[in-house]
């Protein structure tokens, strides 16, 4: 995100350098392109800043969702005294509870994104989709609490719940896979909003067609 902000600052600088401030009188926050198009830099900069902040928040959600893949690698494992991992089959209750906590945090963060003002209908739809998929996953874990909500949850049942590339996904992994797909789509849309805002500054001026006087 720091690199993105630096790029935005550079873009604004280039706009100042390339714009023609001659012609009609402009307000302090306005510049004019060579074709006469007037840009309100305050509004455009605000749009870029808001879109970037929203995309950063979505990235946080995506990072949480993807972290479940790393947690799934600990199924049937324990820490050894040398810092590595050793086998400890059938003791996955705490691991499942940790995944539940992560996805619950996703649901809360997505709920906060729903309250963001000024976002597009496309983003609103994709936010709702992520929230719905998170709820579906949490409900699936709740439905399987008999097998999953105990200290000695088996490796097989745990894989079915939190390992999204497992062959059997009947205890939550299928819902987790759907959540991943939904959050990927939301992040792509959010980043698209940033690019669109930047493009408003950098879109090339259309060349005027030469007059054809006979």
UniProtKB/Swiss-Prot annotation:
<comment type="function">
    <text>The Vlp and Vsp proteins are antigenically distinct proteins, only one vlp or vsp gene is transcriptionally active at any one time. Switching between these genes is a mechanism of host immune response evasion.</text>
</comment>
<comment type="similarity">
    <text>Belongs to the variable small protein (Vsp) family.</text>
</comment>
<dbReference type="InterPro" id="IPR036437">
    <property type="entry name" value="OspC-like_sf"/>
</dbReference>
<dbReference type="GO" id="GO:0009279">
    <property type="term" value="C:cell outer membrane"/>
</dbReference>
<dbReference type="Pfam" id="PF01441">
    <property type="entry name" value="Lipoprotein_6"/>
</dbReference>
<keyword id="KW-0998">Cell outer membrane</keyword>
<keyword id="KW-0614">Plasmid</keyword>
<feature type="lipid moiety-binding region" description="N-palmitoyl cysteine">
    <location>
        <position position="19"/>
    </location>
</feature>
<protein>
    <recommendedName>
        <fullName>Variable small protein 24</fullName>
    </recommendedName>
</protein>
<keyword id="KW-0564">Palmitate</keyword>
<keyword id="KW-0472">Membrane</keyword>
<feature type="signal peptide">
    <location>
        <begin position="1"/>
        <end position="18"/>
    </location>
</feature>
<feature type="lipid moiety-binding region" description="S-diacylglycerol cysteine">
    <location>
        <position position="19"/>
    </location>
</feature>
<keyword id="KW-0732">Signal</keyword>
<feature type="region of interest" description="Disordered">
    <location>
        <begin position="146"/>
        <end position="172"/>
    </location>
</feature>
<dbReference type="InterPro" id="IPR001800">
    <property type="entry name" value="Lipoprotein_OspC"/>
</dbReference>
<keyword id="KW-0449">Lipoprotein</keyword>
């Amino acid at each position: 995100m720091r690199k993105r902000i630096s790029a935005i600052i550079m873009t604004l600088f280039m706009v100042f350098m390339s714009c023609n401030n001659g012609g009609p009188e402009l307000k302090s926050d306005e510049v004019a392109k060579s074709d006469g198009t007037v840009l309100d830099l305050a509004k455009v900069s605000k749009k870029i800043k808001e879109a970037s902040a929203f995309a950063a928040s979505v990235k946080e959600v995506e990072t949480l969702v993807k972290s479940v893949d790393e947690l799934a690698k600990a199924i049937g494992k324990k820490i050894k005294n040398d810092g590595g991992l050793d086998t400890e089959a059938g003791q996955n209750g705490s691991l499942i509870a940790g995944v539940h906590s992560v996805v619950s945090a996703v649901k809360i963060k997505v709920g906060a994104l729903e309250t963001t003002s000024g976002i597009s209908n496309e983003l609103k739809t994709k936010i709702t989709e992520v929230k719905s998929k998170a709820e579906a996953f949490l409900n699936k874990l709740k439905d399987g609490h008999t097998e999953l909500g105990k200290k000695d949850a088996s490796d097989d049942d745990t894989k079915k719940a939190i390992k999204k590339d497992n062959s059997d996904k009947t205890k939550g992994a299928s819902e987790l896979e759907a959540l991943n797909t939904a959050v990927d789509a939301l992040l792509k849309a959010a980043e698209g909003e940033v690019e669109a805002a930047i493009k408003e500054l950098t879109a090339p001026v259309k060349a005027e067609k030469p007059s054809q006087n006979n």
